[in-house]
From Swiss-Prot:
Keyword list, A-Z: Amino-acid biosynthesis, Aromatic amino acid biosynthesis, Chloroplast, Plastid, Transferase, Transit peptide
Stated regulation of activity: Activation by tryptophan (a hysteretic factor).
NCBIfam families per the UniProt record, alphabetical: DAHP_synth_II
Species annotation: Nicotiana tabacum
Presequence range in chain numbering: 1-76
Recorded metabolic or biological pathway in which this protein acts: Metabolic intermediate biosynthesis; chorismate biosynthesis; chorismate from D-erythrose 4-phosphate and phosphoenolpyruvate: step 1/7
Superkingdom per UniProt: Eukaryota
Gene designation: DHAPS-1
Region (Disordered): 54-76
UniProt-recorded name of the protein: Phospho-2-dehydro-3-deoxyheptonate aldolase 1, chloroplastic
Amino acid sequence: MALSSSSTTNSLLPNKSQLVQNQSLLPSPLKNVSFTTNSTKPVRFVQPISAIHSSDSSKNPIVSDKPSSKPSPPAATVTAAATTVTKTEWTVESWKSKKALQLPEYPNQEELQSVLKTIEEFPPIVFAGEARSLEERLGEAAMGRAFLLQGGDCAESFKEFNANNIRDTFRILLQMGAVLMFGGQMPVIKVGRMAGQFAKPRSDNFEEKNGVKLPSYRGDNVNGDAFDAKSRTPDPQRLIRAYCQSAATLNLLRAFATGGYAAMQRINQWNLDFTEHSEQGDRYRELANRVDEALGFMAAAGLTVDHPIMKTTEFWTSHECLLLPYEQSLTRLDSTSGLYYDCSAHFIWVGERTRQLDGAHVEFLRGVANPLGIKVSDKMDPSALVKLIEILNPDNKAGRITIITRMGAENMRVKLPHLIRAVRRAGQIVTWVSDPMHGNTIKAPCGLKTRPFDSIRAEVRAFFDVHEQEGSHPGGVHLEMTGQNVTECIGGSRTVTFDDLSSRYHTHCDPRLNASQSLELAFIIAERLRKRRLGSQNVLGQ
């Protein structure tokens, strides 16, 4: 049940009637689930074990050994610029016939194959029904009826894996989601860069220090960041540890999302201690107090605030699809739809360095049914983007493709309009999302990488300005951030200076927004969503 609302106030704070919308259930892992384990044959078309998926109704038996009757995707030929891509029948291993970039070289191939076979027998980390639900939500964002909030670590680590860190990142995402929801008065789709975001692409295969040359650090699921030969040697056993950490992280996230922690009645308790007395903390507390007032009003009016929709939230996981042998090992045939899903995460994306039309990563992704992201910089040719979307989404399904732009503010204003126009001319449905982090990385005088908050804010504003100019929908934001009180990005209202960087610089890879900076950015985005909403209302009222 929802109260009607047509707020025209200039405040980002909620009316008492805006609270019932946008809270819904996380697809529960405790319902009947469906997955299949990979066979040990070189080419796997049929998996031997299947069961009903979470969030899906099905008349199929709980256990079945019948092969899927779902045909493989038809062959097609796609040409982009000077590259001709011939699409043949897809299998979970067809990517191996393509050139695969950014994959580590394991010295012990027998051990690697043994580990991958072990992971094939493990349960899926996520369920296909959950990925389909996310695709539906992203389809709404493509139409301007929802907004994606995607955030988390640049790269998860084994060392910082603990319940408090997971809780704090989840908590700041809840806070940001509440701010965005009240600004835009639309559902906010919360997706974490969590429970699997380990592997990182590198510019160089090797790193050299003081005349010593070693393999580059590629993420904790591949090798260690310590600069010694043992740490830097790719170790297959790290894949099993990454799987276990991902499963444990998602287990805790599910508990937070469905166990009462995410209840709207707890909105005042989400504030992190170190943001308590900041400007952003004060703004958030004022918003939270209005929420409490509205909940009290609802209870007095006889509207229950104990309904599950007010006590839970949907939350999904995502990571870059980089380490293809691992992703293949967690790919399962869904008995409900007859489609393959990469069950390592709900949402996976292809990066700037691995999105070649004839490359192994694109070949793998075209055959899995998860919602997919494409990272796009100012180097992306509009026609190549159209061809890539054709390969990954030949049925032009809403929610299937999310374009994550990472360009820097000035490049955004120049390059993004051409991409939007090319996609529109092709009639393709995509969700446009801004990644204001990767195009704004600089080196501080002390030698550490950092990102100026002013540059991040400028790119977000440019993203909204371009979509307003083009008449398209700004569908979301993709952030590298943490709930910890780190000093990695300079600027923000609680100014972090170059001199402050070394005090709490904990990232294993790229600099992240801290909780205060993340919340400040959420208020900035919420204001743009509010103005966009009021502008649409004014147009409709004329």
